[in-house]
Structure formats: C-alpha cells, structure tokens
C-alpha cells in the first residue's frame, strides 16, 4: 500500500512543539499531580486529549485561511510524534531511569549494606554519584538533594548527570533501534498477511476521517459517548474541591468481600470501571474478549482451589501474582512466541531470499529495506549486549537477557496490543526469572546481579510504554492516512530524541526544585520501582539462597502445554472460542486493571452482534470511540487545571 505523501515541514515543526508539550504535561501530571497517570498507556490519554485540542485549533485556523489548516496527514504526523513523546517521558523510559541512577546512593544504609554489596560493581560512568566513595550515614549531595529537594539556593548539579544520561540514552536508543527494525519486519506479516486490526490506531484515524456518514464529530453518538465520562469526571473533580458535590465511585475491590476460606485466597481483584477501556474492548472480536476476562477469572479460581488444599503459594518476585501462575504465563509466552514464528515462516523465508538478492518481495514501500532492517536488528541487539557487558554483565547472560526480552516478552506484548487492543503492556516475569527456573539467583555472581538490579528496573520489569507497539501503531496510522511509511522514519526518530532531551531536563529539574524533592512526588518512580531491583537481589548478595522449587518448572510445562493446545485448536478449527493470547496475559497487571471493562464490553458486544448484527455494531462504534475520547480528554483537562491551580484532581481508573 504505497503513497507519495510524505511529512510536511509545517507538520514536523508543530509536531516538535506538541511532542515537547506532551513531555511536560505527562511528567508534571504523573509525578507532581500524582492522581492522573496520563502517559504510560499504549494509547496515552495525554495524546488523545491534546489531539482533540489540536483538531479544534486546526478547524479554527482553517476558517481564517485555508493555508493555515492542517490536512489529515499532517494531523496524524503530529499525533504520532506526541505518542512517542508521552511514552518515553513516562514508564517507557525516563520515569524509570532517572530516579534509578541515584537510588543506590540515597537508599544505601547500614542495614541493607548496599554499599558493600553493590557499590564495588557499579561503573562510575553509569551513575551521577561516586560509587567508590559510599556515604551511608549521609548520602552524596547529588542523590540527597534529588530526593529531598534543594535548599539554600544551591544549583542543580547538571554536570554530574550529563555523562550517565548519555550512556543510558545510548542503551535506550540501541533497544529502541532493535524495536524499530523488528517493527519494520513484522509490519507486512501482521498487517497485510494476518490482517490484525490494531485497535489503538482506530481512534485517531476516525477522528480525522472526512465527513461521509455524517462524520465522526458530527455524529450524535460520538458526543453522547463523550458526555458519559465527561460528566462523571467533572463531578468527581468538583468533589475534591467541594465535598458536597456527589462523587461516583469507579472502583470496587472484590477481595474485601471474600473474607472466608477458601475465597480469601482470591488475592487482589479490583473492579475498575474505565469508560475508555470499555470503548477499546468493544472494538475487539467477541472470542478475544471472552478469552481475556475468562482466563483472568480462572487465575483467581486457581488460587482459591490451591488455597483450599493448603498449597504453598509464594509470590512471583516483585510482581502481583502467585509464582505458580507466573510460571504458567512464562510457559505460555515461550510457546506463543514460537507459534507466532511458525505462522510467519513462509513470510520470513521470503524476507531471507529477498535480502540474499532473490528479490521475492518488494520492500521499497516498507519503513526500512529488509536487508537494512535485519542488519540493524542484529547491530542494535549486539550493541546493547556490549553495553551490558561493559557495565559488568557476563556476555552470555547479556545475550540471554536481551534475547528473552526482545524476541519473547516484547514480541508477545506487541501482539497483545496489535490483536488484543490492550492499553497496557505488562507481563508477569522478567528474563532473570527464566534463569531462576534452572539455578538459584546467587549463582549469577555479584557483578551480574548489580547490573540486573539496574536494567530490571530500567527496562525489563515494568513494560508499560513499550515503544515497539508505538512503531507498529504508527505504521498502521501511516497506512490509514496514505502517508509514505519511510517518511515516518524521521518522525519516529525525532520524536524519541525530543522526548529524551526535554523529558530528562524536566524530570531532573522537578525533584531538585520541588519542596521535599522526589520523596514528595509520586511514590512509584521514586520509592518503589527504583528500589525493587536492589531489594530483590539483596538476599542473594548476602549469601546462597534456595531456588524457586518444584512449582516453577512444573507450572512452566503446564503453561506451555495449555498454550500449545490452545494455539493448535485455534489454528486447526476456526470455531474454537479460546485464544492463547488471553491465557498468556491472564496474570498481568494489565488484566488486573482491565478485566472488568473487558467483561462489560463482552456482555455489550455479544448482545449487539447477536441481536443487531454487524450493521448495529458499525452504527454503535462512534459512541464507544466517544467514551475513549471523553475519558482521555478529561484526564488532560484535569491535569492542566491541577497544574495551574495547584489543586486536587480526580483519580482515573487505570493505575
């Protein structure tokens, strides 16, 4: 699907400004306002909200002069740049990396003995503090002032941050480069051959669609859907200012009502009502919806049954799931990645022959020529492995960690967005958990565990904001807008670089200049994710630790077998209702948050399709897209109000 349309200078310049704005709003809303997390979803609310404002501004400018207006292609170029800016400035990179770099210096104490265990293995180019000079009783000032704020007119120590940020930025660019090349390879198979729907790309395309069928913004159902979350979050926001205004509760915790055995083993089971979540899930096939919520409920039933037999149920390290379920998921990921490879084999053979000179596939309209994509993927992958090795990781472990991350975890997460429309990319295991199935953690050695404590927190543990999905959705948007795919290469690269620079500057400035420093900002980046990697490896640093036991390999095999069965049934019988992707995602934070909106959407859509058919579904789509637009737009509105008025904002149902 080719096109001669490229990226205009006007769209590029506006995109730069919009990307910088998305960085600043995301960073302030998530870190300072705290209640509004608007950047870490795979379709960030800040992007949708700002895009609505951009559409209104473009319409107003067009009335003044046709030359001032923006074409759909230009609007979607700006949208794509904001998409990457929001991801990078949130959990996609910066909120995890920046606090991490001063965490060992600030949180080391005589009790945890991090200075003895970790500091000797930290390379000085990795961090802004001096690891050869641990100050346990009084942290080095670069870390102390970051977490407690600057007093007495001291300046921000920018010079201490520049070097480490450059090195970590290089690692991020290598990983992002591998994802870019992988997306270029996957696009034709997933879009043209398998015809995946890419639900997260549908809303922006619909918002700029020309006015046939009354147009998206002229459709009453669009605004009716918009009004539902707009009214709810207006009331909830006003309730924070004026308690007499009623508040509509969007969160119920089932575990609070399951107090008697064996139901008290159900674990953390919230019911969040996200209108945007219902809207996105409505776009999915009914069998996918059923699989997603069914397998999540099955995890809770497994815990209840295991509890009734007094089975030992340790938790998965630093994940909110039980170990026996986490390793089922791991087995599912490995089989699902193999299944995706299997169904892609004919296409991959064509790519290989094309790169060898046989010329079986025309890659002139792809993001990258196949030969460049394959070479780039190998170079970026090996470059990241060299970075890990330079930081102190054994080369074999670096290749293993990156291999599991890129070709299994990230691949399945990208598929969950492209096919399952999931708003979050979260899994239930890290690459190191695969190693732990075969050997205890302490056998890795202190140097390896030190590097893992950093890269787990920075890249491997929390995958929200995974840019691989941004590349794939961006290419789908380019196709929908008839934009030349290769023209989007500049859009992708520039947006990432702008986000890394603008976001890093602001997120270093903010804790130093805030009252109370990072300790008074959102706790997840400054007192949770940044610490968990070090606390996880701390027992193994102290001495030998036991392995994960029989549950890990046993339930890995169970998960692999179940997924193989589901994949075979789905491949062989089109009527089979259970999707292996639903099983692979069953224990993730994604489904913990969104299982209830998925259930609601399944009930609605199954009845719409049963009693109204495809025609009714098509007519109802604008209502559900309007709910997405309404919830996300209100998140941006309240973030801006909270920033301007220094006032509370309502919580939104995607923690």
Residues covered by each model-derived region:
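Hydrophobic alpha-helical bundle architecture
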Residues: 36-39, 67-68, 282-284, 475-491, ...
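Membrane-embedded transmembrane-helix bundle of lipid-linked glycan/lipid transferases
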Residues: 320-323, 493-497
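Transmembrane-helix bundle segments that line or gate the permeation/cavity pathway
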Residues: 2-468, 502-534, 555-557, 567-574, ...
